[in-house]
């Protein structure tokens, strides 16, 4: 037995040594074994380079070695094809549980579950990566394309995701995050920042999704509440795709035609964005209570507080309202939803002399001729009649700028913003 183990180890080391001598790993007769063995025997800090071509894979590739870079020759040149992935062989395409991981210049296609998942680590960088379900929008597609969860120091840049049945780019329960210069389309949610602290989301294109960009905090998760997000200089347009999310998932309730939704997150600044032609609403600021979903989480804060919306460009949109409260309120809102829709729900326990403290308010200014509605759902939830108003007067003013996340240039594997 010892001799067999020794022989196996020698063979694996020889395989990697040959790969290093011969250059990048090339597609061959058993791509699953070749790539998984390379990941298993990689030394900390190793660069695993893949040649151009299509690697045919039938199970999850897993990595638990720190500081590894997985590098292809371009997102349209090096393709990890999981079309042959069988149930029971792992849901993800690539699963990483090690610090300081970088993946760049390759594509992941047609996974059963998530495209690339990094979980419970420090330092994760995704550069010039494409994740795609090539059949287009389908409820049976994997949930997430690029999926860091419970990660500190995340960089996602210059990447593309299409066809995710939940979110194309999903950053969950994480801290110190930069998401920039990506394109997401034909997903249920294009980009979702969830229960995360310190996120810069900028220069992205989110188009032709059900919802373009979401900043959420959800209950019943290990990491509570999200805050300190800056969303700026993004193009968020034409997110009118019918919702194809899996039943029961929170995103399955997102109305088609949603540009940006901020829900239950605090201290969020949105500025310099171009938000165009999202048929339900260009921007919605809501509490979790407005979803109508119940939860059992005493530590959860369902209210959205401290949101500053300024210097954005709003065009079109709001002409086909739908979703939970559209029928009841669209007539009161003038037959269409304005550019900015606020549910009007505030935490009654935080009122001071009947008013919301300045630092917890919604402020809206310098958005051109953007219009606004307060649906006053707080009165509805209290058993009264709503006093719907389009008056922006109470929302004039500003909040301090949200601080940018930590400089990721100091974090191995996470680049420089």
Predicted regions and their residues:
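C-terminal motif of bacterial Sec signal peptides marking the signal peptidase cleavage site
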Residues: 15-17
């Amino acid at each position: 037995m010892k001799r067999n183990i020794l022989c196996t180890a020698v063979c694996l080391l020889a395989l990697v040594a040959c790969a290093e001598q011969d250059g990048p790993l090339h597609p061959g007769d058993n791509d699953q074994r070749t790539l998984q063995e390379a990941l298993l025997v990689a030394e900390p800090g190793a660069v695993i380079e893949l040649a151009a071509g299509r690697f045919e894979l039938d199970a999850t590739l897993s990595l638990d070695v720190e500081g590894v870079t997985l590098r292809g020759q371009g997102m349209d040149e090096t393709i990890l094809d999981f079309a042959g992935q069988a149930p029971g062989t792992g849901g993800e395409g690539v699963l990483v549980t090690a610090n300081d991981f970088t993946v760049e210049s390759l594509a992941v296609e047609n996974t059963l579950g998530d495209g690339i998942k990094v979980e419970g680590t420090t330092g994760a960088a995704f550069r010039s990566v494409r994740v795609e379900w090539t059949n287009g929008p389908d409820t049976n597609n994997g949930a997430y394309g690029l999926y860091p969860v419970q990660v500190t120091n995340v960089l996602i840049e210059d990447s593309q995701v299409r066809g995710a049945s939940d979110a194309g780019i999903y950053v969950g329960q994480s801290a110190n995050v930069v998401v920039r210069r990506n394109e997401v389309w034909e997903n249920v949610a294009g980009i979702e920042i969830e229960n995360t602290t310190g996120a810069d989301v900028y220069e992205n294109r989110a188009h032709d999704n059900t919802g373009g960009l979401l900043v959420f905090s959800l209950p019943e998760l290990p990491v509570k509440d999200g805050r300190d997000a800056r969303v700026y200089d993004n193009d968020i347009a034409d997110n009118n795709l019918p919702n194809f999310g899996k039943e029961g998932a929170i995103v399955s309730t997102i109305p088609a035609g949603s540009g940006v939704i901020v829900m239950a997150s605090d201290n969020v600044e949105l500025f310099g964005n171009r938000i165009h032609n999202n048929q339900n609403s260009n921007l919605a600021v809501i509490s979790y209570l407005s979803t109508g979903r119940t939860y059992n989480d005493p530590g959860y804060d369902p209210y959205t507080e401290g949101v500053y919306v300024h210097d954005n460009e709003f065009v079109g949109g709001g002409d086909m309202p739908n979703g939970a409260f559209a029928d009841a309120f669209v007539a009161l809102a003038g037959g269409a939803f304005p550019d900015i829709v606020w549910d009007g729900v505030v935490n009654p326990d935080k009122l001071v002399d009947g008013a919301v403290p300045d630092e917890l308010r919604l402020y809206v200014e310098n958005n051109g001729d953007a219009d606004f509605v307060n649906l006053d759902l707080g009165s509805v939830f209290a058993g009264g009649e709503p006093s719907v108003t389009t008056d922006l007067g109470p929302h004039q003013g500003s909040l301090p700028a949200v601080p940018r996340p930590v400089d990721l240039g100091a974090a191995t594997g996470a680049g420089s913003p």
